[in-house]
């Protein structure tokens, strides 16, 4: 990069520190996103457990929407948005645990996880 040819040693050191700090910040954000996905997956399982406890004529849809509405209220998003997030989180956590773990460790971003899940969702297991 020719733009850095005129940079002083102090400026280069500052840039290196900024890059390192941003890398740590990104890894932390990825880790926190994985933690949120884990919590959303648990919330989805809770909704299913609640639905199974009774003989619901809506087959548990009300339980799912109620759990999603509770979460959505504090996150300031709709229950449908939370339902989608819970479904995506359950898929990531249950079907792609190594990807979820890599994201949790900050080795990959949530965007990387989505691409892997999207690409891998259509692949059938050899045992199927």
Predicted regions span which residues?
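Peripheral, non-cofactor segments flanking catalytic/redox cores
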Residues: 1-128
């Amino acid at each position: 990069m020719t733009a850095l040819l005129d940079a002083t040693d102090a400026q280069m050191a500052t840039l290196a520190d900024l890059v390192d700090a941003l890398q740590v910040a990104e890894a932390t954000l990825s880790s926190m996103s994985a933690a949120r996905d884990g919590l959303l997956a648990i919330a989805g399982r809770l909704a299913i457990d609640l639905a199974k406890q009774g003989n619901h004529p809506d087959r548990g849809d009300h339980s799912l929407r109620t759990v999603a509405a509770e979460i959505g209220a504090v996150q300031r998003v709709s229950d449908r948005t939370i339902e989608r997030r819970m479904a995506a989180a359950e898929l990531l956590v249950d079907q792609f645990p190594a990807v979820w773990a890599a994201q949790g460790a900050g080795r990959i971003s949530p965007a990387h996880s989505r691409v892997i899940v999207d690409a891998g969702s259509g692949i059938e297991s050899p045992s199927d």
